[in-house]
Swiss-Prot record:
This is Small ribosomal subunit protein uS17. It holds the Pfam family Ribosomal_S17. Part of the 30S ribosomal subunit. InterPro entries: NA-bd_OB-fold, Ribosomal_uS17, Ribosomal_uS17_bact/chlr, Ribosomal_uS17_CS. GO terms for molecular function: rRNA binding; structural constituent of ribosome. It comes from Paraburkholderia phymatum (strain DSM 17167 / CIP 108236 / LMG 21445 / STM815) (Burkholderia phymatum). It comes from the Bacteria. One of its GO terms (biological process) is translation. PANTHER family: 40S RIBOSOMAL PROTEIN S11 FAMILY MEMBER, SMALL RIBOSOMAL SUBUNIT PROTEIN US17M. One of the primary rRNA binding proteins, it binds specifically to the 5'-end of 16S ribosomal RNA. Belongs to the universal ribosomal protein uS17 family. GO terms for cellular component: cytosolic small ribosomal subunit. The keyword Chloroplast does not apply. SUPFAM superfamilies: Nucleic acid-binding proteins (SSF50249).
Amino acid sequence: MNDSVKTSLKRTLVGKVVSNKMDKTVTVLVEHRVKHPIYGKYVVRSKKYHAHDEANTYNEGDLVEIQETRPLSKTKAWTVSRLVEAARII
């Protein structure tokens, strides 16, 4: 028998951190554009995800990539995989 290597393709999304008030958790706002079926206009749809941040390193305004994982709590099934762009401090 052949030993097959199991490769799992986990979903990844890119979004903006809108809250880091929870311990080891950030709220990430993910926006995507969808074409309206009747009018043809592109509409921005958004959804918020709770993502695991083990070291509490990400701040509000950071652009991060999140990756799907096993359920970590009732509302948290994503982890922050990397920082895409840090927030500008004015």
